[in-house]
Amino acid sequence: MAVIRTVRFEVAPTDVEEMIARRNALVAEVRNAFPDLTEARLALVGERVWIDSWRWESAASMDAAVQAVATGALPAAGPAFALTANAAGESAEIVDER
């Protein structure tokens, strides 16, 4: 079953362009390693607060990608996360889509 991984974080306004570039590099790297990533959407909540929502075809693929980030197997992750603060993530199973 499909799942969503959502991370809420803060970025200084002066770092926004660089954060987006680094995030795009991370999305490309993750998609290359884990093709079950089907969507990656970035939304701005306020001047500093962002929500990044990634849709996965399976929890197993999502978990493997999260583990790859934790172990340093995805080199683009470190630079992407370096510009963020107060990150909090959660995962949820999709139960209905229309």
Labelled PLM ranges:
Residues M1-G72, F81-R98:
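Short S/T/G/P-rich N-terminal loop/turn motif that feeds into the first structured element of a domain
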